[in-house]
Amino acid sequence: MALSANSDAVTYAKAANTRTAAETGDRIEWVKLSLAFLPLATPVSDAKVLTGRQKPLTEVAIIIAEIRSRDGFEGVGFSYSKRAGGQGIYAHAKEIADNLLGEDPNDIDKIYTKLLWAGASVGRSGMAVQAISPIDIALWDMKAKRAGLPLAKLLGAHRDSVQCYNTSGGFLHTPLDQVLKNVVISRENGIGGIKLKVGQPNCAEDIRRLTAVREALGDEFPLMVDANQQWDRETAIRMGRKMEQFNLIWIEEPLDAYDIEGHAQLAAALDTPIATGEMLTSFREHEQLILGNASDFVQPDAPRVGGISPFLKIMDLAAKHGRKLAPHFAMEVHLHLSAAYPLEPWLEHFEWLNPLFNEQLELRDGRMWISDRHGLGFTLSEQARRWTQLTCEFGKRP
């Protein structure tokens, strides 16, 4: 199949040189699901915590899928929940997972549709698709391993590395002096940008912290802010205009995640780009965001939207409309997807999930680099096994 230079990642994936089950007789013969709880070293607070809408975050629920085919190919994927929902995602995944057995592992779209219909009564967004995410991601991992390629290469990578920024050093619970130390450490560790949380009850405190960070970084070093849906429309306009002096890459989630009209008005009114989308849980929701001109940067999250398959559709739509890409969290997956995006993306560096895997991503020159390992390039650590509280298996154990 001939591919044009501007073919999208979905086209590349479908044209990938992989053997089908018709040629190999391969079938999915074993599926294992696990629910692990990853503890955080320090409770984490953003604007929603300071205003009493949420409690500090102390752990992350990780839902893991391990899939093995008759020919011996394996795939690993995961979903997550940062607060309530992890056990529900795991329970739904457990109810639908036996539909995988006997399927051709290359028929990812067919399997996805089958899993959606297995849980049709609970919808096509939210927890229903987040339960499919670890399975879908594991199938893409397996597909790339079968091809003998990193996933990014299977998808037709535009680049071997992606510029990255650090989020975890600038949370609202972190004192300013420590934030400034974190900024220095991040730069020394090869990070290419810094994101600072905003949304303090006292808006002047946001400006004070932002001023100090910009002075520490210098005028040109990439800097972003994230309000975590804290502001109303009036406050967002006022704060957005005050922040234009700081030469920000973007203002993230200034409004409620589902306020498409408000984000569109804000994007039109401000010179600073608007970024949002991390809380959306389906292709259709992202379609509304993109077609509504509600953001300059789209921030889909593969585990939240249902896996790599819907993420690729979001990427395709975003690229057609000239939107920039800055995926949320899950850098282990999003590095590969970002590398396959035609416009230069940003990748969020979050070290929280590092203990789950035996391998780590390489940071250098402000960028995150794709390894030559096949698939996603990760194997589960013994620590991940120790944190696991629930497991279930289907099919013939390897």
Swiss-Prot record:
Catalytic activity: L-altrarate = 5-dehydro-4-deoxy-D-glucarate + H2O; galactarate = 5-dehydro-4-deoxy-D-glucarate + H2O; L-altrarate = galactarate
Listed GO MF terms: galactarate dehydratase activity; hydro-lyase activity; L-altrarate dehydratase activity; magnesium ion binding
Activity control, per UniProt: Competitively inhibited by tartronate.
CDD domains xref list: MR_like
Residues that, per the record, bind substrate: 46-48, 82-83, 195, 228, 348
PROSITE patterns documented for this protein: MR_MLE_2
Result after altering residue 197 to A: Loss of dehydration activity on both L-talarate and galactarate and loss of epimerization activity
UniProt key word ATP-binding: no
Cofactor: Mg(2+)
Keyword Ligase: no
Record keywords, A-Z: Lyase, Magnesium, Metal-binding
UniProt enzyme class: lyase
The protein's Enzyme Commission number: 4.2.1.156, 4.2.1.42
UniProt note: phenotype after gene disruption: Cells lacking this gene lose the ability to grow on L-talarate as carbon source, and are impaired in the ability to utilize galactarate as carbon source.
Free-text comment on the cofactor: Binds 1 Mg(2+) ion per subunit.
Active site residues of this protein: 197 (proton acceptor), 328 (proton donor/acceptor)
Miscellaneous remark of the record: The enzyme product is the enantiomer of the product obtained in the galactarate dehydratase reaction catalyzed by OB2843; the enzymes thus differ in their regiochemistry of dehydration.
Family: Belongs to the mandelate racemase/muconate lactonizing enzyme family.
Subunit-level organization: Homooctamer; tetramer of dimers.
Role according to the record: Catalyzes the efficient dehydration of both L-talarate (also called L-altrarate) and galactarate to 5-keto-4-deoxy-D-glucarate (5-KDG). Also catalyzes the epimerization of L-talarate to galactarate; epimerization occurs in competition with dehydration. Is required for the utilization of L-talarate as a carbon source. Also functions in galactarate utilization. Is not active on other acid sugars.
PANTHER family: ENOLASE SUPERFAMILY, MANDELATE RACEMASE, MITOCHONDRIAL ENOLASE SUPERFAMILY MEMBER 1
Protein name (Swiss-Prot/TrEMBL): L-talarate/galactarate dehydratase
Species of origin: Salmonella typhimurium (strain LT2 / SGSC1412 / ATCC 700720)
